[in-house]
Amino acid sequence: MFQGASSLNLDAKGRMTIPARHRDALLLQCEGRITLTKHPDGCLLLFPRPVWEMRREEIAKWPISARAWQRIFLGNASDVDFDGAGRILIAPELRTAAGLTRDVMMMGMGGHFEIWDAARLAESESDAIAAGMPDVLNDFSF
């Protein structure tokens, strides 16, 4: 299970170094083979390839009424591998879709990661806090 936030930078070629704590786990779990795709919240999703392959099968079975969402998730999926320095190359189309510039955040979300433009994530979190807790979390406490 992946958790935690990492503040990272994209280089001029659109490469991002995976933090060592996650890189080691991803190398063990999937030999550094991952899949990136769009998320409608304005970020990218990063899945270990075996996890993505299960998700891909589920998404492919969605009814025709969900075709646009299949296009968003499957049509934008990009398989990538770590390079020798533990970096991944994020395709220009995906960088543009998520508004990724130089400063990015990688958020562990259990079985996958979200990759956000740092400013966009800060705005999203601020909006969520201002909106208050959703009703579904009324009974949740630490």
Curated annotation (Swiss-Prot):
CDD domains: MraZ_C, MraZ_N. GO terms for cellular component: cytoplasm; nucleoid. Keywords: Cytoplasm, DNA-binding, Repeat, Transcription, Transcription regulation. GO terms for molecular function: DNA-binding transcription factor activity; transcription cis-regulatory region binding. Residues 5-51, 77-120 form the SpoVT-AbrB domain. It holds the Pfam family MraZ. InterPro entries: MraZ, MraZ_C, MraZ_dom, MraZ_N, MraZ_sf, SpoVT-AbrB_dom, SpoVT-AbrB_sf. Coiled coil: none annotated. The keyword RNA-binding does not apply. GO terms for biological process: negative regulation of DNA-templated transcription initiation. It is found in: Cytoplasm, Nucleoid. PANTHER family: TRANSCRIPTIONAL REGULATOR MRAZ. Forms oligomers. NCBIfam families: division/cell wall cluster transcriptional repressor MraZ. Belongs to the MraZ family. This is Transcriptional regulator MraZ. It comes from Herminiimonas arsenicoxydans.
